């Protein structure tokens, strides 16, 4: 996926101010360290890339050859459906483009905010401001990043809702497709039944035709038999006439009987002919009616078959249209899913990048806070030494003010010798011993409170970082090791401090033995300072134990 940014979005003034920021080197002002620490440089300009969103729609040209056979009403309905679907797709694309533009604007805003925060961080590093400002600044940045993450989560949920809606539409189309498949199977079943009926009607017609042929043969046979019978009867009648004529002379009384017999046979022949004609006519009528009925049934079956074929063709075209629509929607859904996944991955990369930057910034802040604490300790030690020197000078001045004018030179020489010895011994001791020996208790407690506040700030920053990113097993082990090492270092420092304190006490006792006479007030002051030192040490140890607990 292409990046969200392009070069035309940035003007020359913006590049000059934020993108092309020169590298700033910050040297630590900590005494005793000569190495310089270089501050981090601003982030490079975002990689330019062009953004292109291309959408492809499935054309309806493949449906035109099949739509020519449909009615005008069906064509109008299908065109209306296609228009409504196209308008819906255009609306969805417009909505997605608007959201994409809002995402781009949000990314630019976050980048600008990041640049502003980087500039503020550089200014704060240069000024060495208080750690509390850093904390408030980064807490605000963390809140902004969390709000941005929540917005991205909400957008993701909205896109998931749209995806669920598209899936519901797809399920509806699949259900409709299944219904159309069932209706097609029903139509095919009815078509098979109609075909079976047509086949049965054709078989019945063939049987009836065969029966008609057999009946016609039977009629012809009966006609032939009837004609033969008539011929036989006529032959018998002629033979009877001949015999009657031959016997007229001998038997004149048989003519009436022959006439009666002839009349009877003629009546019987006429009756047989009439019965045969009536039976033939009735049989022919029945066969004609049955043939007409079968013809109507065959015609109805043919009409039903043609209607079923037309319906099957229409349903097939509709199924193909639904299938094409389904494929187009599936393709669109796949494209939307790919785009959403790409957007989500890009947003996740941005969030991870911001989290990494925040983590590095927090680590740098912790490092700078530690350096600040070290500098504060050095400053505190220097202030303690200055206060000790000031107190020694004030003690000398007060002591000299009460001496006589005659012993001014002697007292001044003794005090200068004592001051030289004490100053030389104080310079030999460490700054930490000087601070615990002769600095006022309220100032020491104030410095300790500042140290505790700085340490609490560092621990709070580490705790927030740990909350924002849950540590893995390896990180947890490393943190445990670091804690153990820190505890071991703290214990070693405490032991070294105790050893130094013991050595300082020994040196002080030796110096106290050497400094005899004229230093009673200084001895009392050193005793008071030692008592205050012990009290401060007890209070510091109590605070350290409470902090460890």
UniProtKB/Swiss-Prot annotation:
Q: Where is this region: Head?
A: 2-92
Please list where the region (Tail) is annotated.
397-549
Question: Which GO terms are recorded in the biological process aspect for this UniProt protein?
Answer: anterograde axonal transport; axonal transport of mitochondrion; intermediate filament organization; neurofilament bundle assembly; retrograde axonal transport
Q: Where in the cell is it found?
A: Cell projection, Axon; Cytoplasm, Cytoskeleton
Q: Give GO cellular component annotations, separated by semicolons.
A: axon; axon cytoplasm; intermediate filament; neurofilament; postsynaptic intermediate filament cytoskeleton
Modified residues annotated as Phosphotyrosine in this record: 43
Checking SUPFAM superfamilies in the record gives: Intermediate filament protein, coiled coil region
Q: Where is this region: Disordered?
A: 462-549
Does the keyword field hold Coiled coil?
yes
Single GO MF descriptor: structural constituent of cytoskeleton
Acidic residues: compositionally biased ranges:
471-534
Q: Where is this region: Linker 1?
A: 125-137
Which residues are annotated with the PTM Phosphothreonine? Answer: 526
Q: Which UniProt keywords apply?
A: Acetylation, Cell projection, Coiled coil, Cytoplasm, Cytoskeleton, Glycoprotein, Intermediate filament, Methylation, Phosphoprotein, Ubl conjugation
At what positions is Omega-N-methylarginine found?
23, 30
Regions of biased composition (Basic and acidic residues) lie at 535-549
- Cystine pairings recorded for this chain: none
Q: How is it modified after translation?
A: O-glycosylated.
| Residues recorded as bearing Asymmetric dimethylarginine in the entry | 23
Question: Quaternary form?
Answer: Forms homodimers (in vitro). Forms heterodimers with NEFH or NEFM; which can further hetero-oligomerize (in vitro). Forms heterodimers with INA (in vitro). Interacts with ARHGEF28. Interacts with TRIM2.
Other notes: NF-L is the most abundant of the three neurofilament proteins and, like the other nonepithelial intermediate filament proteins, it can form homomeric 10-nm filaments.
Name of this protein: Neurofilament light polypeptide
Give the organism, scientific name.
Answer: Sus scrofa
Write the lineage as a comma-separated list. Answer: Eukaryota, Metazoa, Chordata, Craniata, Vertebrata
